[in-house]
């Protein structure tokens, strides 16, 4: 019989095929799985280590051909960035001294913390300074861009910066008067080259001693173009001239007047508040027509409320608040009050009123305004209105609660020449007791309303600040002075919180504390703080020890404190004026000494203005120079600095005029210097639409 086939062989073959298929399936699945894991890991690492900077275009970075250095070359040249080779430190990076193989020295600036701001400054250096060649500017030799590393290579300046020579701790200054005057002239020529020698003009935006470097012959050169801008024709521009300062918005030119002595129709209410906040003891004109107090709330009858009211005799409520011991000011018969329009003119400036300074506080203004708006049927506000109507003459007269309670003698000394006013005086004495009984209840209701309004505003502002934070995370930042460009919503939040904390705002200057503890401090603080707090006129004991504030804030022009986002040539002129005073005096623009007798000299700009008023400007000259300086040149420099430090940009001289004045080819303009505090400028659209 034939043998039967073995049935185990097909089964074995089938099992092997099944096993092989299973192995291939599992292995391929594992390979795909690990490939996906590797891809995710690689993507996560790349996103984690990605540089949070703007895309960098090397080809378009600089119009000139700059040398491209490698990271290894710079590491060898600086001895692995050793601390012994550090020659300077700035806000965005550290500067090292490097040596090439052939023995040449150069300076290497390393950007420490990469961000949108530092990357923008890095590209500004390449685009602006890389395209400029001048003997008055530091030469940019090259750059390095590798991964997250950013380096700028400059020519080496052996005498370092002007700041180190002026403020060295050893006290041995090698800057005699000839060198100081030469440095001032060199900086002026550098600005002249940037403003008039470049097409389009270049605005530096950060003129200060640390950015003025000195070569082996003590010739000055300007460096650090991280905040500089190119002025482009056809873009958006601003006119920060003194139209608002003079109250002239129609375009007509009016002569500039000091803030303390306003003239009719020239000073607005906000400006008067700034003048009052700059000095406790100063008294500006209380005429309602001068200060444009169109929103003064007068209680009227129902028939005349909201309409134009012309009275023969109207008591002035403001004079009782400002000076209770004096006679009441009377409005002229031609004066017209429009409550509807006037209420809109207050704006945000009326919140600047300071408590404890003999002036109305913000709550008083609200009480006065609400007293004129709420119907007399409301018992809580019945006493506030106090409408006294004489049916015989038809004259409505409003009495003042605070003037009566605080100073009864002020009313007794007042002169009443009409029967209507005598009748008003009798009515006041009859209702005096009734008002005193309801006073506590009335103020309690007002405080409750006030707290509700504050709470509602804080809730609304928190929503605004949340939206602004999201925008900032999306890199919606301006690359200029960061502290000048807070958004409007953020400003309102900080302003409201600052009223209780007494913090610093670049838009409104210093705000005093409004709580009870701040009132105690006000009694001890006789010095006043005005709008000069955020410009070169800055004076504060708390800020005197802050290096960054000294380094930049004191050199900023006043118009940038008002929220200006665009640099102008006159801003460089203001910074140059502060620089002149620093070079001549050999001291910082803000320096509080230990002796309280020398506090008036702490603010260099204010002290210089005081000396100019007294006619002894040479007292400002550095004591280290003794008598080894030219008095005519020193006086010329100080007077030129005062001309550059004028609050209105259009009153400052051009840099070409500055150079001619320093050379003796031109005299300083006879325009009277303004020694009043500098109010914040506002931004107005320019017809030329120029963008800088």
Curated annotation (Swiss-Prot):
Residues 81-673 form the Protein kinase domain. It comes from the Eukaryota. SUPFAM superfamilies: Protein kinase-like (PK-like). The keyword Cell inner membrane does not apply. The chain crosses the membrane at residues 20-40. Residues 427-446, 511-533 are annotated as: Disordered. One of its GO terms (cellular component) is plasma membrane. Its EC number is 2.7.11.1. Residues 432-444, 511-524 have a biased composition (Basic residues). Belongs to the protein kinase superfamily. Ser/Thr protein kinase family. This is Putative receptor-like protein kinase At1g80870.
